């Protein structure tokens, strides 16, 4: 399904926060858009713009159902994970001393925004260390959450490491 993986000497590609490989179905849909619907959704009232607006509304509805979102208004589209993380980091109101937890295995997309906010606004960015086997240290995470107390504003972790493919136990993290 992924043409980039069918080339000579394919790679194990894990850098999806930057650019995700696209399957044929996505490539074909993008090509179809440029041929049949080259309009601006939500802005244009001509045939192309109206078609794009309907497609976006239907996509939002489908995704809201998939993610069990209470409203289609909670579904937004961004360019990529980097853009999304920057929107969250820069879009929230932060107070000096607010704690943000990340891991020691984060992609720069999930590290740089917090380092910038630490410098610019005085948030307290803390890094959860990995275990010796490079897995997520749930005990250290729980202790760091307890230490932060009510100053903990954000836990921002990658589900899978882009360099090594090691999974972060998201379900367990959400229970803490």
What are these regions (language model features)?
Residues 1-176:
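Pyridoxal 5′-phosphate
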């Amino acid at each position: 399904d992924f043409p980039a993986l069918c080339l000579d000497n394919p790679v194990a590609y894990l850098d999806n926060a930057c650019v995700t490989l696209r399957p044929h179905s996505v490539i074909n849909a993008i090509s179809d858009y440029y041929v049949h619907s080259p309009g601006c959704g939500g802005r244009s009232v001509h045939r192309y713009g109206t078609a794009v607006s309907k497609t976006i509304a239907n996509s939002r509805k489908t995704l809201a159902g998939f993610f069990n979102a209470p409203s289609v208004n909670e579904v937004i589209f961004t360019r990529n994970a980097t853009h999304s993380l920057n929107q969250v980091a820069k879009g929230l109101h932060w107070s000096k001393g607010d704690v943000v937890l990340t891991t020691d295995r984060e992609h720069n997309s999930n590290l740089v925004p917090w380092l910038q906010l630490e410098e610019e606004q005085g948030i307290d960015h803390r890094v959860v260390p990995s275990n010796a086997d490079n897995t997520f240290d749930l005990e250290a995470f729980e202790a760091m959450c307890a230490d932060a107390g009510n100053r903990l504003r954000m836990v921002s972790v990658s589900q899978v490491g882009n360099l090594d493919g090691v999974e972060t136990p998201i379900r367990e993290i959400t229970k803490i």
